């Protein structure tokens, strides 16, 4: 398992209102899984992944 830092913005669906943005550190098997984990955390919001890298 590796540690990834995922930079993201989460918006209310159908809106330009930012609900959350920042960088989250996630332990996962791959960068893709780290991004999917972050999207699951913010289920119900539109999540844009800005950048993902190994921490």
Task: Label each residue range with its predicted role.
Residues 19-29:
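A short, exposed loop/beta-hairpin motif centered on an aromatic-Gly-Thr core
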Residues 27, 31-37:
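Mature extracytoplasmic or otherwise solvent-exposed domains
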Residues 40-55:
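Short, mixed-charge low-complexity intrinsically disordered segments
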Residues 1-21:
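Short aromatic-glycine-(Arg/Gly/Cys) micro-motifs in beta-strand/loop hairpins
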Residues 14, 18, 31, 54-55:
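Acidic interaction surfaces
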